[in-house]
């Protein structure tokens, strides 16, 4: 099947401004599968260079482009005739216009390329790097920036989530200027039947410049074949956000709302800070919050604890219907992004406020009860210690997933579809699957020759059958 002419005219390249992830720098190439035996080579190449430009220098920046100051050449620092040139400063021939949010450092030895994310962007957004990802811990460890490498290990693309970039640009009074070059090349045995006059075309559409050409192939391709190339040069702007809630601390106009009364009356999250009432939530909220890295669930009593998508949880209680109740002003003090998580599970008040929560917050009399979830870890440890003290070896094997299993072993699992089954699986993994059968066999004796080695439950049952009478006689 022949490749369409439109493919080489590159009118399908999406503007960066509409994308969820904005490339800050890209140097990528790809060899594509041939759609037919006639096509012997099909490749693409993309280069994108960007700079954060101060708003007052927007006009000067527009004079620069792919062949004039904004491409994917490596950055350099050093002393020029006019003074010191900093690698992170984006400038024309006369003055600084902004900053390079990514600095490309070239290392001669080994022909290495290292891409550095601008430290001001990292600090301003509160990012934490793990490998090739940058996360924002205070926002539920949201992934903000990601770096991609090619098969050769060289950096190929670094991109940032649009809303975070726009927040930063708004705070700094900047706009992102982008210059790119896109190329699509085909080598084919037959000459493409395109409608281009004189085997080529040129077009300028807005800020885009398109070119196409069909000519005889040259080395290293067979000279009796045809070489087709389509190219696009583009400059474009990614505008700043209207507000900056993260960096500048602007108020979020799109705040969540919460049901306050049985009649369905609601209040905005921003209006809850001084509210003297309680909000009610479906218990499925817990699973949503704990999906976030850093999310936590701690217990203060049988029906109260702290819960949140970050380590700074809010005081909650469980009422007689199993609903989660929280003092409204505690929700009002959460960040907007976390309020949205809570709002999705907000329900009409029903069943009254948790008695233990009311006693703790309004009467300063915290309950002396204990949540079974809070005793699970210590119960397992005590059992393991008792077995070790008696028989000289651990009953339960250590496993790196124990901490996460304990976090998920809670009553709210049962509120989810198939949640009770999942809860039973978590408890099984915590105890049954960690039992060291060999440690038990060392106490009760190995199976007879020819008998199958018992599983965890069978071994535990045999241990109980042998040791229980001894324990009773010792009482």
Positions of the model-derived regions?
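Weak global preference for isoleucine
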Residues: 3, 22, 27, 48, ...
């Amino acid at each position: 099947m022949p490749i369409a002419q439109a493919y080489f005219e590159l009118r399908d390249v999406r503007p960066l401004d509409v994308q969820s992830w904005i490339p800050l720098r890209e140097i990528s190439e790809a060899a594509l599968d041939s759609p037919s035996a006639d096509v012997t080579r099909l490749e693409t190449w993309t280069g994108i260079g960007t700079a954060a430009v101060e708003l007052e220098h927007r006009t000067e920046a527009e004079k620069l482009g792919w062949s004039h100051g904004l491409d994917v050449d490596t950055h350099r620092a050093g002393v020029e005739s006019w003074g010191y040139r900093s690698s992170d400063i984006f400038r024309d021939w006369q003055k600084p216009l902004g900053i390079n949010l990514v600095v490309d450092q070239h290392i001669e030895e080994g022909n290495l390329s290292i891409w550095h994310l601008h430290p001001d962007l990292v600090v301003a957004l509160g990012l934490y790097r793990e490998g090739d990802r940058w996360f924002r811990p205070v926002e539920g460890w949201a992934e903000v920036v990601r770096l991609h490498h090619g098969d050769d290990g060289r950096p190929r693309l670094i991109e940032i989530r649009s809303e975070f970039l726009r927040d930063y640009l708004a705070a700094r009074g900047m706009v992102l200027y982008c210059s790119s070059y896109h190329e699509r090349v085909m080598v084919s045995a037959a000459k493409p039947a395109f409608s281009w006059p004189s085997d080529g075309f040129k077009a300028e559409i807005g800020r885009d410049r398109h070119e196409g050409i069909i000519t005889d192939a040259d080395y290293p391709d067979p000279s009796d074949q045809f070489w087709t190339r389509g190219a696009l040069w583009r400059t474009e702007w990614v505008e700043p956000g209207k507000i900056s809630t993260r960096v500048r601390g602007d108020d979020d106009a799109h705040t969540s709302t919460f049901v306050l009364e049985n009649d369905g009356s609601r209040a905005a999250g921003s209006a809850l800070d001084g509210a003297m009432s309680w909000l009610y939530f479906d218990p499925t909220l817990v699973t949503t919050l704990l999906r976030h890295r850093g999310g936590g669930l701690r217990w203060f009593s049988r029906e109260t604890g702290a819960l949140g998508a970050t380590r700074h949880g809010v005081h909650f209680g469980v009422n007689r219907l199993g609903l989660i109740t929280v003092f409204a002003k505690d929700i009002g003090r959460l960040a907007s992004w976390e309020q949205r998580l809570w709002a999705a599970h907000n329900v009409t008040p029903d069943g009254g406020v948790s008695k233990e929560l009311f006693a703790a917050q309004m009467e300063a009399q915290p309950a002396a009860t204990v949540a079974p979830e809070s005793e699970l870890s210590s119960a397992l440890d005590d059992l393991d210690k008792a077995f070790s003290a008696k028989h000289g070896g651990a009953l339960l094997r250590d496993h790196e997933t124990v901490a996460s299993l304990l976090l998920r072993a809670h009553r709210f699992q049962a509120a989810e579809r198939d949640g009770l089954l999942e809860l039973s699986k978590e408890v099984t993994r915590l105890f049954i699957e960690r039992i060291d059968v060999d440690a038990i066999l060392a106490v009760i004796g190995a199976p007879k020759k020819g008998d199958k080695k018992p599983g965890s439950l069978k071994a535990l049952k045999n241990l109980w059958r042998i040791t229980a009478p001894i324990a009773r006689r010792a009482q």
